[in-house]
Amino acid sequence: MKKAIFGAMTALITPFKNGKLDEAGYEKLIKRQIKNGIDAIVPVGTTGESATLTHDEHRICIEIAVETCKNTKVKVLAGAGSNATHEAVDLAEFAEAHGADGILSVAPYYNKPTQEGLYLHYKNIANSVKIPVLLYNVPGRTGCDILPETVIRLFNDCENIYGVKEASGSIDRCVDLLAHEPKLYVLSGEDAINYPILSNGGKGVISVTSNLLPDQTAALTHYALDNEFLKAKEINDRLYNINKIMFCESNPIPIKAAMFIAGLIDTLEYRLPLCNPSVDNLKKIEETMKSYDIKGF
């Protein structure tokens, strides 16, 4: 049986203060996730603004995540993707050497590899480490789609590739993957379809909303994994509006604004080209948040 990291996972935001990484603030956010029942955290992914972090900042985030989760049940699935295979390998090796439990590796963006190129890319990454590797398919951002046959080929050929974070927005894709390979771990990468994916055999979620509502995301996921689908759906229905507003602008713009409004980060800062949400959207985010019980530190 393959070693896997699954369940309720949070795609962590990266807080900044005066343009620099807010290390103390980052640690506080992680401790709050641990306290509220999350199974794993995902530092330096899309939501963590990995594209605009320096390599040093990327590594510091992983180190803080590993150190903060030490001696807890919470796993660290470190973001370690790149559109250059050698760089993705370097990041994967760093994550493993510094104690990450696994890595999340986004499909190479911009250079649009073929399916064979994707296979070779991921096979090189998997061969470079022993920890679990989760593929990350998000064609809307990368311009590159890891097709089901490539996912299954990698799952069968690489011992430590255990599944895929599916953020294509297609429930059919997830059903198709599981129909062809029931042992594959399919994780939802879009909060709006967490419940449909979980109720069709998905093994967890990598959530943006759980930055704000980790307890609710954990409860939804755990109910679904325990086959208590009515309870899971009740929570999913309650989360509908907040999940929707979190994508009123490009992620992670809305979730960072929400975290600031909730007092969970000290300053609302992004790295350009990301910038503050519009005044109208900021008001909508704030209004939507009033319907939810947001736990503090």
From Swiss-Prot:
Keywords: Amino-acid biosynthesis, Cytoplasm, Diaminopimelate biosynthesis, Lyase, Lysine biosynthesis, Schiff base. Pathway: Amino-acid biosynthesis; L-lysine biosynthesis via DAP pathway; (S)-tetrahydrodipicolinate from L-aspartate: step 3/4. HAMAP family: DapA. It catalyses: L-aspartate 4-semialdehyde + pyruvate = (2S,4S)-4-hydroxy-2,3,4,5-tetrahydrodipicolinate + H2O + H(+). The record marks T46, Y110 as: Part of a proton relay during catalysis. It comes from the Bacteria. Pyruvate binds at T47, I206. It is found in: Cytoplasm. Catalyzes the condensation of (S)-aspartate-beta-semialdehyde [(S)-ASA] and pyruvate to 4-hydroxy-tetrahydrodipicolinate (HTPA). It comes from Campylobacter fetus subsp. fetus (strain 82-40). Belongs to the DapA family. GO terms for biological process: diaminopimelate biosynthetic process; lysine biosynthetic process via diaminopimelate. This is 4-hydroxy-tetrahydrodipicolinate synthase. The keyword Cell inner membrane does not apply. The gene is dapA. Its EC number is 4.3.3.7. The keyword Isomerase does not apply. Coiled coil: none annotated. One of its GO terms (molecular function) is 4-hydroxy-tetrahydrodipicolinate synthase activity. Homotetramer; dimer of dimers. GO terms for cellular component: cytosol. It holds the Pfam family DHDPS. InterPro entries: Aldolase_TIM (IPR013785), DapA (IPR005263), DapA-like (IPR002220), Schiff_base-form_aldolases_AS (IPR020625), Schiff_base-form_aldolases_CS (IPR020624).
